[in-house]
Swiss-Prot record:
Coiled coil (UniProt feature): 322-489, 608-637
Keyword set includes Coiled coil: yes
Lineage: superkingdom: Eukaryota
PANTHER family in the cross-refs: COILED-COIL DOMAIN-CONTAINING PROTEIN 22, JM1 PROTEIN
Keywords, comma-separated and alphabetical: Coiled coil
UniProt similarity note: Belongs to the CCDC22 family.
Protein name: Coiled-coil domain-containing protein 22 homolog
Matching Pfam families: CCDC22_CC, CCDC22_N
Record flagged with keyword Coiled coil: yes
């Protein structure tokens, strides 16, 4: 019972009942029993107890009504034992335990865990796997990338698409890294069947897409086998290093193209055939680029050459050396002037770059605005073209209005007749399809029921297996404990003691058997004596009766003897009945004593003082209600 009480307490805690750790079912009062049963019923069927309060009412009549309603609900659920409101108001441990066990069996089954994985987790894993399979692009069975059927695929036919590259939704880390990519895939990306111009190009496009992915993967594997293994890095670091190298090369090439394009003149309007260098030089924003880096270097070197030439001329002309010799301070001043001029040129160039960048941004915004306006104008043009075509057709039909009306009427009649024929044909096709659908649906429902029943059986078997495993483990532990105790027990015990005890128990059993046989023999002998005595008494009574009747004809005293004998017979019969009744009464007394003991065991927790107090409360409530009724009647009169 302690194990059952422990399971019940755990279940009640799971249902949300506030139970202390050291509390047991024996300590439950009527308030606690009401809360616990209400928690059970709310999980089983909340609609039936939706009107009941969370706590037991203080009013006695309301208590009786609430407990009666709960008792009726439990009986309707299939409870077979006797149950009434007094079983809940004055709880008994055995009755409450039975009720809790019954309600626990009606609770909805929880998830049965097997191997540490619940059914809900298994269903989530299946859903994730199926979602991943749906998101993946279809791969033909003969494609090596699918890794399904090994073999030689050199004879596989490759297809090319005329509808452009396909856009397949990607998954994994790219969705988390790229913001808005998942929204684009779910809301704006067209389905695979609409990305091609023709329906016939869908399969070839898919084949080409899959083979291109396989080719890229093969190239990556070949590159890794050729270069990556010798680099001493793992594949992830090798890819990152390669990406960095590619980005650095691109940056260097762009930077070099910008530097090389600094000396070129940039036209204001770029044609569609302009090169990448021209576009970059245009974005630099200076057509002449007077202050370019290489122009400045060239000018600076030319000035140095001129200065060197002048110095050579001064050395040749010995007469002008003294007048043209420059001091160190003058040189520094000249260099400072050159540096200031270069700095001013740099500032002008940076300002011009900023201005041209602003102009470029304005140009881009204007270009986007013009593109949006062009799209709107194209849409308006398409709408106007449709309206123009409709109006053109209507105006062309106005010349012969009556004839055209007749033709339209005939076309309408023909279309209506075609629709009727098609509806009839559709009904012919629809009926077998519906019947087949219904049969398949019924079959599916039956299969679902069978699978459900099988799953329930599997769950029950798993529970049983777990119980058996736990029992086996307990038995193993018990066996191990007993074995340890046996090993630790003293080995000097004498075998004669055990044999003597066994012999004593056998002797006691034999003595008890002899006593039982004696009692049975005495009862048999007593029954025989009773039977013989009753037989002799009946025979003597009949004999005496016959003798008295024979003597009564001759002797007057015999008649008086017959009367006294009849009185004795009547008293004897009464005595016999009283003896039988006393025996029956004694048997009934024994039965009633056993029942009283049984009932006392049930009602050992029943408090008579509490019942008397409740009775007094009910009487006081009844008196107050009677007074209220009288006052209401008097007020109405």
């Amino acid at each position: 019972m302690d194990e059952a009480d422990g399971i019940i307490l755990i279940t009640l805690k799971d249902l949300g009942c506030e139970i202390e750790e050291n509390e047991t079912i024996k300590n439950f009062d009527s308030e606690m029993v009401y809360k616990c049963i209400l928690a059970y019923l709310r999980v089983i069927n909340e609609q039936k107890v939706i009107n009941l309060t969370n706590t037991l009412p203080k009013n006695m009549s309301a208590r009786v009504n609430a407990c009666s309603l709960i008792a009726n609900i439990i009986k309707d659920s299939g409870y077979r034992s006797e149950l009434s409101y007094h079983n809940l108001l004055y709880p008994n441990v055995n009755d409450i335990r039975k009720i809790f066990i019954f309600l626990g069996q009606l609770l909805p089954k929880k998830e049965v865990e097997s191997g540490g994985v619940s059914i809900q987790k298994l269903e989530d894993q299946i859903c994730q796997y199926l979602q991943g399979c749906v998101k993946e692009s279809w791969i033909p069975y003969f494609c090596p990338f699918s890794k399904r059927i090994p073999g030689n695929y050199s004879t596989a036919t490759l297809f090319t698409t005329t509808g452009g590259n396909l856009r397949i939704p990607s998954r994994g880390r790219q969705l988390k890294v790229t913001p808005g990519l998942e929204q684009y895939y779910s809301q704006y990306l067209e389905p695979l069947t609409l990305q091609t111009n023709r329906f016939e190009d869908i399969a070839p496009s898919v084949f080409e897409y899959n083979l291109s992915i396989y080719a890229e993967a093969q190239e990556r594997d070949n590159e890794w086998n050729d270069k990556g293994v010798s680099s001493g890095m793992n594949p992830i670091d090798y890819r990152k290093n390669k990406q960095k190298q590619v980005l650095s090369k691109m940056n260097d090439s762009i930077r070099q193209s910008i530097i090389d394009g600094g000396n070129n003149q940039i036209s204001s309007n770029c044609n569609s055939g302009d090169s990448f260098l021209d576009i970059i030089s245009e974005f630099r924003g200076n057509s002449l680029d007077v202050g370019g880096q290489f122009n400045r270097k060239k000018a600076f070197t030319n000035e140095l050459n001129n200065n060197n030439n002048n110095n050579n001329d001064s050395t040749t002309n010995t007469n002008k050396v003294e007048t043209e010799i420059e001091t160190e301070e003058q040189r520094q001043l000249k260099r400072q002037a050159e540096i200031d001029a270069l700095q001013s040129q740099i500032d002008e160039i940076s300002e011009s770059i900023q201005l041209h960048n602003k102009e470029m941004l304005d140009f881009l915004s204007l270009m986007r605005q013009s593109e949006s306006e062009n799209l709107e104008q194209d849409q308006q043009r398409e709408v106007l073209e449709k309206q123009y075509k409709i109006k053109k057709k209507t105006f062309s039909l106005l010349d012969d209005a009556e004839g055209n009306m007749k033709e339209l009427q005939s076309l309408c009649n023909q279309t209506s007749s075609n629709l009727l024929e098609m509806s009839g044909e559709w009904e012919k096709v629809r009926k077998p399809i519906i019947e087949k659908y219904r049969s398949l649906k019924d079959k599916q429902n039956n299969q679902a029921d069978e699978t459900k029943s099988k799953l329930d059986r599997i769950k029950e078997m798993r529970i049983l297996i777990k119980k058996l495993v736990s029992e086996v483990q307990q038995k193993d532990d018990q066996f191990q404990q007993l074995q340890d105790q046996y090993k630790q027990a003293p080995k000097d015990s004498n075998r004669s003691q055990y044999t003597r005890r066994i012999l004593e128990t056998v002797k006691n059993i034999k003595k008890q058997k002899v006593d039982i046989d004696k009692v049975l023999l005495d009862t048999k002998n007593l029954q025989k004596e009773i039977n013989t005595i009753t037989d002799t008494a009946v025979r003597t009574f009949e004999l005496v009766k016959d003798l008295l009747y024979n003597d009564a004809k001759k002797d007057q005293t015999a008649k008086q003897a017959i009367k006294s004998f009849a009185i004795i017979d009547d008293k004897f019969q009464k005595l016999f009945k009283t003896i039988d009744e006393t025996g029956n009464f004694q048997n009934n007394i024994l039965n009633l004593n056993s029942k009283i003991e049984h009932v006392s065991q049930k009602t050992n927790t029943l408090n008579s003082d509490r019942v008397v107090q409740d009775l007094k409360n009910i009487k006081s409530e009844n008196q107050s209600l009677i007074k209220q009724i009288k006052t209401l009647i008097e007020t109405k009169n």
